[in-house]
Amino acid sequence: MLKTTLLFVVTALAEIIGCFLPYLWLRKGGSIWLLLPAALSLALFAWLLTLHPTASGRVYAAYGGVYVAVALLWLYWVDGVKLSAYDWAGAAVALLGMAIIAMGWQRS
């Protein structure tokens, strides 16, 4: 389960970086060259999704929980926004959902 969770975290980071760089270009006046690493990051994200150990729909459902948690950590570390109790509670519920789904596919 730890290996799967770490793979989900790396996958989430690839997706977030791939989306954040165009945001910097479009909204913050960044260089158009940000689109090149963004495209590479999104390609890495798509490839990483193929490494997960079960059917794609189940992977996407479980991955969503980890994505929520990683996105909130990004909000805190990169955007400098203090997380609320609701943020932490939402992340905990999302991660619990991911764990339940992952336990189910490991038993199948």
Curated annotation (Swiss-Prot):
Topological category with respect to the lipid bilayer: Multi-pass membrane protein
Cellular compartment(s): Cell inner membrane
Keyword set, alphabetical order: Cell inner membrane, Cell membrane, Membrane, Transmembrane, Transmembrane helix
Transmembrane segments: 6-26, 31-51, 61-81, 85-105
Family: Belongs to the UPF0060 family.
Listed name of the protein: UPF0060 membrane protein CJA_3703
Main localization (coarse): membrane
GO cellular component: plasma membrane
InterPro entries registered for this protein in UniProt: UPF0060 (IPR003844)
Species: Cellvibrio japonicus (strain Ueda107)
Protein origin, superkingdom: Bacteria
